[in-house]
Structures are given as C-alpha cells and as structure tokens.
C-alpha cells in the first residue's frame, strides 16, 4: 500500500515541502533561520491574537487596556512581553537570514529574493504599527514623526499625511486603522511566506559552497527537522529568558508614560531594529533626501543580484569580499548605535560617514572587489 502522505492531495504538498524535500547535505546552521522565522511568526500571531482579545483601539482606553492586560488577565504580562520581545527575536532572525543570503549568494534566486525583500517591508510596516498601539509617549511621537515623512513627497505630501492620519493629527482614527492593519498584515505575511517557499522549492536550496548539489541531496526529514528543532529550542530559550528576566531590556521607558500631544520626549527614536535606517534618515539635512535615503537603504537589496560581478556564487572562497562583508555588518552595528544617540556632535558626522560607507560598500566596493578577485584567479 502506498503511504498516505504521498497520495493524499494535502499531505502530498506537505510531504514535498517538509519531509521528502531533497536538501543539500552540507547546509550549515545559517540555514536554520528560515524555519526560526516561521516559528517567530507563529508565536507572534498566537500571542497577538490573545492580546487583541483584551485590547481596545481607542485613544482614551488603549494605554489602560495594556495595563489591564498586564495586571488582571491571567498571564497577560507574559503574553504581552512575549509579543514585544518576540518582535525583537523576529528581526534578529530576519537580519541574520538576509546576511546569510548576502554572504552565500542566495540572492541569485531572484524570485525568492524579491519576495523576501517584500516580506521584509511588510514585517517592518507591521512592527511599526504594533509599536503605536500601546499609546505611550514613544508610540504617539514615533507615529507622528514617521508618518510625517510622507509630507516630504512633492505636491501630494500633505494630503497624503492627512489621509493616513484620518484627520489633522495622529488621533483616534489613526490608532483604529493602525490596529486593523496590524491585525491583518501578519496573515498577508503568511501568504507571502508560502509564495517565498514555493519559489525556493522551484530551484532548491543554495549551499555554503555556492555550487550545484544535485548529486548530493538528503531528505529534509529526519536530518534537517532535528536540526531545526534544536534551533527552535535555542530560540525559545533566549525568548523566554528575555521575557521572564529582562522584559523591558529592549523597550523604551518613555512608553510607560501615556501619550501626551503637548509634551515632546527629549529623544524620539523607534525600536532598536529600525535604528540603522533611522540613523541614515537623520544623517541627511534635507527632508526629502533623508526619506529617499531611508527608502533606498532597504530597496538597495533589490539591486544586489544586479551588482553581482563575481564568477563565484558564494563568498566562502573570496577573502576580499569577506572582509568587505564584515565591514558592512560592523557599519550596520555602528548605524544602529548612532540611531539611538542624540542629534549632536560627534554623532552627526559619525552617522553621515557610516551612511556614506553603507552605500559605498554595497554599490561600489563589493562589486569592485569581486571583479578584482576574478582577475586574480585569471577568470
């Protein structure tokens, strides 16, 4: 008798995706982060669902509804902090996943890569809107500052901002629509993830050496399922440790003060995972220029397949490119640190230099290094 998992219409799809999927035998732990992102998304949707059962998207009661969740709901404090810190874990996994794609040349699967960039944008939008919901000081002012960037768009800017706000300032209408969008977007992310996997399984996974591995494939289960379970346990350990021992470590103390339109916080800054982009935005004195730089700092990922000049796919055997890659990672860490600092000397000039270096590395230095490596290898 044929196994049901190979004949049943639904089981057959799952079987081809997670059980009998031919996988390269040499993929390292850097390939674990895709499944970890799936786990993060599941945790976020489940905790978010329970939070939505008790939350009220109204300016007069939003802040107190969060207090009610933390004080009166059974394990509400835990659900709330799992959701907040789960977002941080999500972005850590996301950035490592993108970094691995850059290092090993996975971006040459163009369809998969482009859907991935779209997923990044959607996740960033979801996280931003989620940060507004507690209606604390940083929620309100973060929403005001970031949505106000749309006013830099010539001619239609002001109209667009008022359309997004649903009025003449960030108010009840803004909070209600942000809650609606924050609720629906994760399900759109699930749909996009399915498409992401669909495109990936058209080509099969890349591997650390960046060479075809068709002659050396192993089934996904049990070899990679057990490996993914270990990764999942480690991720949950870190998330639970963070949630139970230092729940507010990555948050902003200002968000424990209810939103007050008459009192501006000393330093308006987004969550830590947006600080690198925020630093790039702030480093340009012109408003429109800053917005374009902010947008391009993420959109640049779409151009990476076009900037690939090396004859080798992976950076595994390219020391010059490796050096520039780690310089880029360091630069992003510097930008993240700068984004959290006040706008004063020496942070302004450091942010400007780090921003210039970021674009230079991706657009000029890395393609040039690849070209030089080709010449050295007489290719």
UniProtKB/Swiss-Prot annotation:
Cofactor annotation: heme b
InterPro entries: Cyt_b/b6_C, Cyt_b/b6_C_sf, Cyt_b/b6_N, Cytb/b6-like_sf, Cytochrome_b, Cytochrome_b_C_euk/bac, Cytochrome_b_N_euk/bac, Di-haem_cyt_TM
Principal location listed in the UniProt entry: mitochondrion
Cofactor note: Binds 2 heme b groups non-covalently.
Annotated GO biological process: mitochondrial electron transport, ubiquinol to cytochrome c
UniProt-annotated binding residues for heme b b562: 83, 182
Entry function: Component of the ubiquinol-cytochrome c reductase complex (complex III or cytochrome b-c1 complex) that is part of the mitochondrial respiratory chain. The b-c1 complex mediates electron transfer from ubiquinol to cytochrome c. Contributes to the generation of a proton gradient across the mitochondrial membrane that is then used for ATP synthesis.
Listed name of the protein: Cytochrome b
Species name: Lipotes vexillifer
């Amino acid at each position: 008798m044929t196994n049901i998992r190979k004949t049943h219409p639904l089981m057959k799809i799952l079987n081809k995706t997670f059980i009998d999927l031919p996988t390269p035998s040499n993929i390292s732990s850097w390939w674990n982060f895709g499944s970890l992102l799936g786990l993060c998304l599941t945790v976020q949707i489940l905790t978010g669902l329970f939070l939505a059962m008790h939350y009220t998207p109204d300016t007069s009661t939003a802040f107190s509804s969060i207090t009610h969740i933390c004080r009166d709901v059974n394990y509400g404090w835990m659900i709330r902090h799992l959701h907040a810190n789960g977002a941080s874990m999500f972005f850590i996994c996301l950035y490592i996943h993108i970094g691995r794609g850059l290092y090993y040349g996975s971006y040459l699967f163009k369809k998969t890569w482009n859907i991935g960039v779209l997923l990044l944008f959607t996740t960033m939008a979801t996280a931003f809107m989620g940060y507004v919901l507690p209606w604390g000081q940083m929620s309100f002012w973060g929403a005001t500052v970031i949505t106000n960037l749309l006013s830099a768009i010539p001619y239609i800017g002001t109209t667009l901002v008022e359309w997004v706000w649903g009025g003449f300032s960030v108010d009840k209408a803004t909070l209600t629509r942000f809650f609606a969008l924050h609720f629906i977007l994760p399900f759109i992310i699930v749909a996009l993830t399915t498409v992401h996997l669909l495109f990936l399984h058209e080509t099969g996974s890349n591997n650390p050496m960046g060479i075809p591995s068709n002659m050396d494939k192993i089934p996904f289960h049990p070899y990679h399922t057990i490996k993914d379970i270990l990764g999942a346990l480690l991720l949950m350990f870190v998330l639970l440790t963070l949630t139970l021992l230092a729940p507010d470590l990555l948050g902003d103390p200002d968000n424990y003060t209810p939103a007050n339109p008459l009192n501006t916080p000393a330093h308006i800054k987004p969550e830590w995972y947006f600080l690198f982009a925020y630093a790039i935005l702030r480093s340009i004195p012109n408003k429109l220029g800053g917005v374009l730089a902010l947008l391009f700092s993420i959109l640049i990922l779409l151009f990476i397949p076009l900037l690939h000049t090396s004859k080798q796919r992976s950076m595994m055997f390219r020391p010059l490119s490796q050096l520039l890659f780690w310089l880029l990672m360091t630069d992003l860490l510097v930008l993240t640190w700068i984004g959290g600092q006040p706008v004063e000397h020496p942070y302004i000039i450091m942010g400007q230099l780090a921003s210039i270096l970021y674009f230079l590395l991706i657009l000029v230095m890395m393609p040039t290094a690849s070209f030089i490596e080709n010449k050295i290898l007489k290719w």
